[in-house]
Swiss-Prot record:
Sequence similarity: Belongs to the glutaminase PdxT/SNO family.
Gene Ontology CC terms, in alphabetical order: cytosol; glutaminase complex
Gene: pdxT
NCBIfam families: PLP_synth_Pdx2 (TIGR03800)
Active-site residues, record numbering mapped to chain: 83 (nucleophile), 178 (charge relay system), 180 (charge relay system)
Protein name: Pyridoxal 5'-phosphate synthase subunit PdxT
Subunit structure of this chain's protein: In the presence of PdxS, forms a dodecamer of heterodimers. Only shows activity in the heterodimer.
Pfam families from the UniProt entry: SNO
Binding-site list for L-glutamine: 52-54, 115, 142-143
Catalytic activity, as annotated: aldehydo-D-ribose 5-phosphate + D-glyceraldehyde 3-phosphate + L-glutamine = pyridoxal 5'-phosphate + L-glutamate + phosphate + 3 H2O + H(+); L-glutamine + H2O = L-glutamate + NH4(+)
Function: Catalyzes the hydrolysis of glutamine to glutamate and ammonia as part of the biosynthesis of pyridoxal 5'-phosphate. The resulting ammonia molecule is channeled to the active site of PdxS.
GO biological process: glutamine catabolic process; pyridoxal phosphate biosynthetic process; pyridoxine metabolic process
Length: 197
């Protein structure tokens, strides 16, 4: 089994380690590959879209990689997006300060995301968060977005003051926090429930 990590920016190594730890825990071997070009998507069983600065990631991909990624996910490739990854997966994105962003997105999930919802770096925080089907995890929110509205096929796995830190829709899981910094429980759930099914 091959799991890809979009490797343009963000906690790439931490996601790779969380996937390896999860596969050991589940009792199977996984090859983790870094995805930097459309051709790297071939033969994947799932993909992680890490956090980072969303407009920078889009520019680094030249859009071409993201469009190929979108096609793969629409064709059933299981995907997990954290922080900026959740922004890319949303059908609607706004910014806390400027409103409409016009930034490139994949537009896959029935949800509205507000970038930098909690403010700047100094407003970053950690908390224990209960995720349906996963349990309690230590959630790290770093310049985090917030999912403020869901509709259609999107379902919340948790709620936080009127926002949804974890949302699932079909083969996609979006998280506004960074699970890779504290636990592999979320990655394990992703592998078990979305990749192996």
């Amino acid at each position: 089994m091959r799991i890809g990590v979009l490797a343009l920016q963000g906690d790439i190594e931490e996601h790779e380690q969380a996937i390896r730890d999860s596969s050991r825990s589940l009792g199977f071997k996984v090859d983790v590959v870094r995805v930097k070009r459309p051709g790297d998507l071939k033969g994947l069983s799932g993909i992680l879209i890490p956090g980072g600065e969303s407009t920078t990631i889009w520019k680094l991909s030249q859009g071409e990689l993201m469009l190929a990624l979108r096609d793969e996910i629409l064709n059933g490739l299981p995907a997990m997006g954290t922080c900026a990854g959740a922004i890319f997966m949303a059908k609607e994105v706004k910014d806390r300060v400027v409103g409409e962003t016009g930034q490139g997105i994949l537009g896959l999930m029935d949800m509205t995301v507000i970038r930098n919802y909690y403010g700047r770096q100094r407003e970053s925080f950690e908390m224990d968060l209960n995720l349906e089907g996963i349990g309690s995890v230590r959630a790290v929110f770093i310049r985090a977005p917030a999912i403020v509205r869901i509709w259609g096929k999107a379902n919340a796995l948790s709620e936080l003051n009127g926002t949804y830190p974890a949302v699932i829709q079909d083969n996609m899981l979006a998280l506004t926090f960074h699970p890779e910094l504290t636990t592999s429980k979320v990655h394990e759930w992703f592998l078990r429930e979305l990749v192996l099914k």
